[in-house]
Amino acid sequence: MTETFDIAIVGAGITGCAIARQLARYDLSICVVEAGNDIALGASKANGGLVHAGYDPAPGTVKAQVNTRGCELYGTWAQELGFLFRRTGSMVLGFNDEDRAHLEQLRRNGQANGVPELSIVGPDRIHELEPRASADATCALWCPSTGFVDPFEVAIAALENAVANGVAFMRSAPVEAIEVAGSSDDARFTLATPTGNVRCRYLINAAGNGAADISHMAGAEEFQMVWRQGNIVVMDKEPRTLMPLYPCLLYTSDAADDLIGVD
């Protein structure tokens, strides 16, 4: 069986579901194609849920533009879709003059990217904001707009809204091959899956860990995935709203090409 749509979105993680929800506003036929048997089973299910404010990306990059705007929009999305979003704020801690210079650079990045209310604060303000921060911290970049979500909850809310507005959802449908033919005026892409084929005019690659494979099959840009892993250690079980704290710099170990730091 083959179904035809204007747009096919490969991947039902938080990114694919959010894209589907936004595109459902338009008069388009859309299908989300997911390899797993449910949504958000890839990277979306196993990350910290931090909504970055946008002071890290280099000004002028696409990431800088979408990062700041996305953080701003999360408050609106939370109200519209009914998921929990907490603006806890965050601090990047510094311990010496070198760290302070790096924090100033992050502040300049953030200001250029449109991040609101960034400031460099001293020890008194650090411990007022987070009493359990290191007593050795001499300065910090304070960013009030950083927030937290549950990525699984956001993905569910976004896709439920999209499906309610006519978006089709195929699960247990890993893309095995992509045939490319014709122009954008026709059903240019044909996606082969175990549960049936999907034809579409436009293909959106939101496949997360499998994005490079989808890009290769579609004859698009070849790229290599660079994997990252963060480890979160729970050291305090007291129920309270926690603020994310970061060291100023990440250091490469002498033994291997590993980055050592706290996330």
Regions found by a protein language model. Give the residues of each.
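Helix-loop-beta segment of a Rossmann-like dinucleotide-binding subdomain
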Residues: L84-V92, H127-N165
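Flavin-dependent oxidoreductases
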Residues: A18, I178-V180, A187, L191-S253
